Structure formats: structure tokens, C-alpha cells
Amino acid sequence: MLFCFCFCGFKFEMNLNFCYDECNSKKGGTDMGKLLAKERQKEIVEYINSTGSAKIGDLADKFEVTKETIRRDLTHLQEIGAIERSHGGATLVSSFRPIPIETRVSENSSVKYALCEKGLELIPEQGVIYLDAGSTMQCMAQLLSQKSGYTIVTNAINTTYHLNNGNNVTILTGGQLNPNNMSTEGFQTTNFINTIKVDISFLGTSGFEQHNGPAVSEFTDAQIKQAIIPQSKIIVVISDSSKAHICSLVQYANWKDIDYFITDKELPSATYKTLSELTEVILV
């Protein structure tokens, strides 16, 4: 009876191992096949960035997982803006093309709220705040609407909808409407910004890979950001870590000009090390 129990136990253990290998690897459970999902997705982005595109079958072979697993990975990476799906695979994200604000608002919303909550800790009491245009700043506006006593300047029309619910002074800059992010821009906007001083500015980025600072996809957006930087005592850039894998069109500042960079803990360690030498990086 004892022998039979041990034998069955051995068989059961072997079957478990077999199932694990079948689910996680097509080649017998190598280290590549056992990568955690987040690690694999990070390497998928790096691979596509280096090659320009990749087929689902090739990725499945490379990472030793099923095609269905790769499809789920690519769906998630597309949702966070790290890659673009193509027929049978994926390509580099078209980061030079502006993405409508309605699309960006829902991406990584829980992460954005967590980052903005950390940003609230940097705001001086009764401070004057500048909020950039972008989906992350809408999260910040919703949090600020629960506070009172602040003066908030913004060029983002959608942001004012949220600020209207709070007990703060809200100032909207003038200028020409940019329908991509529902913000004002142009000479009137920069001219107004040049007349004010603020305690702290919160800025976003659509990607900073291959740049020495935060970057965006439109020159007019970069111009507004460049205008507010010298008018601010404190400059804070807030972005989720996926932007580390996206190369946007135009850099608007150097990291050494940024006082704080708030991002999540999925930021690649090499990127964290590099940025930490130039600015204060806060991981949430």
C-alpha cells in the first residue's frame, strides 16, 4: 500500500509538471517559457522596437508560449499604447501621430490616479497650480476638485469640467482649439502664460524613448510646455512607465530641468538608473 501511494504520488507530480510545461512552454519548460507575463510583455515591446514589427507565430516561437498567449499580450500592449496590432502580428506604435484624448483617458486609469495622488503631496498649501493638457491631468483635476483653496491654471478644456465641481479658482488660458486633446494653443496661449507665475506645474509626456527628456507628438503642445517651465517654481512630469518604450516626435525639456518625475514601479531598472542621475524619480 505504501509503495502504491508513493508511486501514485510520483505519477501525479509528473503530470502536474507536464501540465505546467504545456501551459507555459512549447519546448519543455525552458527559462524563456517560464517568463512572467509582465516580463514577457516588456521583452516583446523591446523586440518590436528593435525589429519594427513581429508576427504572432514568430513571437510564440521566440518566447516559447502559445499563440493565444501572445495574442493576449499584444491586446494588452495595444491598450496601454506600447504597440499597434497589425494583421497577424504587431508593429511599432505610431507615436508621431497624436492619439485623441477620448482614447487616452481610459488607458491605465487606475495607475494614473495613483500617480496623481502622489503628485498632490508636492502641492504647497493655497498654491497656484498649472495643469497640462492630457488624460493624466484629467485624473489630477478630479482629485483637486475634492480640495479647496487653490488657484488652478490650465489650457485643457476637458480639465475645467472636473475642476468646476470643486471650491477652487480655475483659470482657462485663451487660444486656438486643438481637437486632439481639447486644449488651447498658439500665440494667445503662450502670451498669457508668459504673464503668470505658478508654484507648481504638472506636465505629461506621450513617450521619451531615445530622448534626453520628456517628449510629445505635436510641436504646438511642446511649445506650451516650454512656455510654462520658466514660469514655475516646481516642474513635475507624471507618466506611467509604458511611455519609456515609446519614442515621441519632439522633446520639450531636458530631464535636468524637471524637478520630479512620478511614474510606476514597472519602469525598467536601466531607465530608472539613468533618469535618477538627472532628476528625482518617484516610483508609485
Give residue spans per PLM region.
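Short, Lys/Arg-enriched N-terminal segments with co-localized hydrophobic residues
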Residues: 4-31
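Intrinsically disordered, low-complexity regions of eukaryotic proteins
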Residues: 15, 23-24, 75, 134, ...
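Conserved phosphate- and dinucleotide-binding cores of soluble alpha/beta proteins
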Residues: 16, 28-36, 46, 53-57, ...
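HTH-adjacent hinge/linker in prokaryotic transcriptional regulators
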Residues: 29, 33-43, 47-57, 62, ...
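Short secondary-structure capping/turn micro-motifs that flank functional sites
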Residues: 64, 93-94, 179, 209
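Conserved SAM/SAH-binding loop
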Residues: 137
